[in-house]
Swiss-Prot record:
Gene3D superfamilies: Aldolase class I. 4-amino-2-methyl-5-(diphosphooxymethyl)pyrimidine binds at residues 38-42, 70, 109, 139. Its EC number is 2.5.1.3. The keyword Metal-binding applies. Pathway: Cofactor biosynthesis; thiamine diphosphate biosynthesis; thiamine phosphate from 4-amino-2-methyl-5-diphosphomethylpyrimidine and 4-methyl-5-(2-phosphoethyl)-thiazole: step 1/1. This is Thiamine-phosphate synthase. It comes from Nitrosococcus oceani (strain ATCC 19707 / BCRC 17464 / JCM 30415 / NCIMB 11848 / C-107). PANTHER family: THIAMINE-PHOSPHATE PYROPHOSPHORYLASE, THIAMINE-PHOSPHATE SYNTHASE. Keywords: Magnesium, Metal-binding, Thiamine biosynthesis, Transferase.
Length: 217
C-alpha cells in the first residue's frame, strides 16, 4: 500500500474546517487531484468522529483514494479505513499493525529526526513524515525540518517520504526534488476559496500520476 503514498496528501482537520462542510471539502480536494485523505480530529467526541470518518470513507472510496485516520487505529478498523497516522505520543506501529493487519498503511511523524524515521522503517512503517518545512499557521510547533534533511532521508530510506508544513504550490517543487514522495497540506488547501483549484495547483507537480477518478455505479 505504500505505493499509494504519493502526490497531494490532503489533511482534513476538523479544527480548521466547519463540520458541515467537511465532506464537500474533501470531495473537492479529491476532484482537484488529491491522492489520499487524512481525517484529523483531536476531540473525544466518539459518536461524531465515527460518523464523520465513515462519511469520508464513502467519499474516498468513490474516488478510489485511501483514507488515513489520525491517531486512532481502532476507529480506522471500525470504519474500514486504509490506515492510520501516528505521532510521537500515539500508539506504536506494532499495536496499530495488530489492530489493522498487514495490508494497512501506517505512517509515522518524524519531525526533523532521521533516526526516528530509520527506526520506523525497521518497525514496519509504510511512510514517514517530516516537517514543518516552512512557516505554517496550522503547524506552529517550533520544530523545523530542512530540505537537506529530506535529501539525507531519501538516501537512507526505502519507503515514501511525506513533507508537511507551509508547503504551497510555489515551493512544492523544491520539496519534491529534495526527496518527498508526497506533500501534506492542511491550510494551503482547505483554507483556499477554491479547494478544487488549489488541489490542482499542487497536483501539477506530479504530472505522471493520474487524477483519482470516481467509480461508476
Amino acid at each position: 500500500m505504500s505505493s499509494s503514498i504519493r502526490g497531494l496528501y490532503a489533511i482534513a482537520d476538523t479544527h480548521l474546517l466547519p463540520r458541515q462542510d467537511l465532506g464537500n471539502a474533501v470531495a473537492l480536494a479529491l476532484q482537484g487531484g488529491a491522492s489520499l485523505i487524512q481525517y484529523r480530529d483531536k476531540s473525544q467526541e466518539i459518536t461524531r468522529r465515527y460518523k464523520e470518518a465513515e462519511s469520508l470513507q464513502r467519499i474516498c472510496h468513490q474516488y478510489q483514494a485511501p483514507l488515513i485516520i489520525n491517531d486512532d487505529a481502532l476507529l480506522a478498523a471500525e470504519i474500514g479505513a486504509e490506515g492510520v497516522h501516528l505521532g510521537q505520543d500515539d500508539s506504536s506501529i506494532t499495536s496499530a499493525r495488530k489492530i489493522l493487519g498487514a495490508k494497512a498503511i501506517i505512517g509515522i511523524s518524524c519531525y526533523n529526526d532521521l533516526a526516528r524515521a530509520i527506526a520506523a522503517e525497521q518497525a514496519g512503517a509504510d511512510y514517514v513524515a517530516f516537517g514543518r518545512l516552512f512557516p505554517s499557521i496550522t503547524k506552529p510547533e517550533p520544530i523545523w525540518a530542512s530540505l537537506a534533511l529530506l535529501r539525507e532521508a531519501r538516501k537512507n530510506l526505502n519507503l515514501p517520504i511525506v513533507a508537511i508544513g507551509g508547503i504551497t504550490p510555489e515551493n512544492a517543487l523544491q520539496v519534491i526534488e529534495a526527496g518527498a514522495s508526497a506533500v501534506a497540506v492542511i491550510g494551503g488547501l482547505f483554507k483556499s476559496r477554491d479547494i478544487r483549484a488549489a488541489a490542482a495547483a499542487y497536483r501539477q507537480h506530479f504530472p505522471s500520476w493520474n487524477l483519482p477518478k470516481p467509480r461508476l455505479f
